[in-house]
Amino acid sequence: IMDRYQPDGIFSNRWAGHGICYCEHCRKNFREFSGFELPAKSDRFDRVYQKYTEWNTGRLRELWLLWDDVIRKKKATSRFIPNGFPDKVITGRLSDIVFTDHQARSGVTMPWDNGKVAKELRASIGMKPLGGIFSVGLEEQYRWKDSVQTEAEIRIWVAEGIANGMRPWFTKFSGVLYDRRWLEIVEKIYNIHYRNERYLRNIAPLARIGMVF
């Protein structure tokens, strides 16, 4: 991929897996690390699972650095971007740019939840670029990726992220557009962002004197 296309970065989705892996390699590596067998279930109060979390985070970090090193040897300005690294502090230390995959709300989630996620990441990554990935479709239990939400729903979700320091990054699945209503909505979002970007980036205070009362 790097030799042929020279991309600016490779974003790896769902790379951390789901739950505990019981393959022969994970069994062997975890046993050598901890002296334990892999835990039977995810229980954060279990001592063995706590060791598993420590080992798993360390292993993911090793893979992150390995793949990033290979990519940068092919193109120095390119990066490997892991989606959803479990430790936000490590993410802040190692990343030049961070993405949050919080595409839309579901159920009774409040609109300001997107801004809350941005604030949490700012606490660990500082002022590094933060891309807020958003989707145009429904994000309920049964996700239909060809669906399109209302303009008001999409815009308020993205606006909350932008207001708290995110840069908008939209995602759309499938190369065929069955419902084109989202195109104009996303165009509006980016036009508004472009017109106001200088205020969103240049946020260092100009004041030299502060008053405390």
PLM regions: where:
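Aromatic- and acidic-residue-enriched segments that line the glycan-binding/catalytic groove
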Residues: 7, 12-43, 95
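Carbohydrate-binding surfaces of carbohydrate-active enzymes
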Residues: 7, 47-213
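An active-site-proximal structural segment forming one wall of the substrate-binding cleft
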Residues: 1-17, 70, 192
